[in-house]
């Protein structure tokens, strides 16, 4: 008996690429998605056969593509970043913006909350990483030994005993920063193309990075060294660890690959069936990934504006 993924349905509501998806253990029937349609949709998951969920509320305010969205650990707030150069903090009970964060001089590509929700980090096309408090005050701008190209992704480690930020950029570098003094801790060198994404494991012990070269590189955050590399065969747009299995999930071109990290083998490859009359039509690319908090459901956002939903099932392959 093996675990595999079974398609469960779709979420329709966006009119632009789905750039990010956020879930929270506090509200298992809600997810948020960010899009190039400049909005964030709050979904109510119905788990119906036809429609897996319905758009409950649209968070509007950004004047350009929304690139990233995360939910605070209490499930009350969302944080977004957009190509309008700003971050926004949203009250999810009212759907209103409670704070605007102004300071980046170019598109914001990535945002994150610290484990205690007291700190916010953002990465931008202005090549800087900024640390903010929740009142919208920029406390620090990381430029020393910083990225020399666009900062495509920033993430906090969930491990409070090793307070770090991990970032990656179009300079092919993965950088680990000491949160206490905002100084560079480690440069992870090895990628041969620009980077789109970095993700930290649930226990904070390792991170994975990916981008143009199609290699998912795994790094030990405690030792500061390269562990191993998994070849996805196509550009990696998003990566995420399963919250409860030793799996790494990669959005790679039009498909999703799931690796079992113990055996470094592919558990499953998820492709959506595209019924197309024009064989030259480019299949939609997978641009975002998020697991439900219980690790049973995978949400994936695409360039055809849909979110596709898979579930872990026991199969007899």
UniProtKB/Swiss-Prot annotation:
Main site of residence?
Answer: cytoplasm
Q: Give the UniProt subcellular location, in the record's own words.
A: Cytoplasm
A GO CC annotation recorded here is: cytoplasm
InterPro entries, from UniProt? G-protein_beta_WD-40_rep, RACK1-like, WD40/YVTN_repeat-like_dom_sf, WD40_repeat_CS, WD40_repeat_dom_sf, WD40_rpt
Q: Which GO terms describe its molecular function?
A: ribosome binding; translation regulator activity
> What keywords are annotated for this sequence in UniProt?
Cytoplasm, Repeat, Ribonucleoprotein, Ribosomal protein, WD repeat
Signal peptide residue numbers = none
Q: Name one GO biological process term.
A: regulation of establishment of cell polarity
Task: Tell me where the WD repeats sit in this chain.
Answer: 13-44, 61-91, 103-133, 146-178, 190-220, 231-260, 281-311
Query: What CDD domains does the record point to?
Result: WD40
Database matches in SMART domains: WD40
Pfam families the UniProt entry points to: WD40
Membrane-spanning segments = none
Q: Which family does it belong to?
A: Belongs to the WD repeat G protein beta family. Ribosomal protein RACK1 subfamily.
What function does this protein fulfil? Involved in the recruitment, assembly and/or regulation of a variety of signaling molecules. Interacts with a wide variety of proteins and plays a role in many cellular processes. Required for VANGL2 membrane localization, inhibits Wnt signaling and regulates cellular polarization and oriented cell division during gastrulation.
Name the chain's protein.
Answer: Small ribosomal subunit protein RACK1
Q: Where does this protein come from, organism-wise? A: Oreochromis niloticus
Q: Which gene encodes it?
A: gnb2l1
């Amino acid at each position: 008996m093996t675990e595999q993924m079974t398609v469960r349905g779709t979420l329709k509501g966006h009119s632009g690429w789905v750039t990010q998806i956020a879930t929270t253990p506090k509200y298992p029937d809600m997810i948020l998605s960010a899009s190039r349609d400049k909005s964030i949709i709050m979904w109510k998951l119905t788990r119906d056969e036809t429609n897996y969920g319905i758009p409950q509320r649209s968070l509007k305010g950004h004047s350009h593509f929304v690139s990233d969205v995360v939910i605070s650990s209490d499930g009350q707030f969302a944080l977004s970043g957009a190509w309008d150069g700003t971050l926004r903090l949203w009250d999810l009970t009212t759907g209103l913006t409670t704070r605007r964060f102004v300071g980046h001089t170019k598109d914001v590509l990535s945002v994150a909350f610290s484990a205690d929700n007291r700190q916010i980090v953002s990465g931008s096309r202005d090549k800087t990483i900024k640390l903010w408090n929740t009142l919208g005050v920029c406390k620090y701008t990381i430029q020393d030994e910083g990225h020399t190209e666009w900062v495509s992704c920033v993430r906090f480690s969930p491990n409070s005993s090793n307070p770090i930020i991990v970032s990656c950029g179009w300079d092919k570098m993965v950088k680990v920063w000491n949160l206490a003094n905002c100084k560079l801790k480690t440069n992870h060198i090895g990628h041969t193309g620009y980077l789109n994404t970095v993700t930290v494991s649930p226990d904070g012990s390792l991170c994975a990075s990916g981008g143009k070269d199609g290699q998912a590189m795994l790094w030990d955050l405690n030792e500061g060294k390269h562990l191993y590399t998994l070849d996805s065969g196509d550009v990696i747009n998003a990566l995420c660890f399963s919250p409860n299995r030793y799996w790494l999930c990669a959005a790679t071109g039009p498909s999703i690959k799931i690796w079992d990290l113990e055996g470094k083998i592919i558990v499953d490859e998820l492709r959506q069936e595209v019924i197309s009359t024009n064989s030259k039509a480019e299949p939609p690319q997978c641009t975002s990934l998020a697991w439900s908090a219980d690790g049973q459901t995978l949400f994936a956002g695409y360039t055809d504006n849909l979110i596709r939903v898979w579930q872990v099932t026991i199969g007899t392959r």
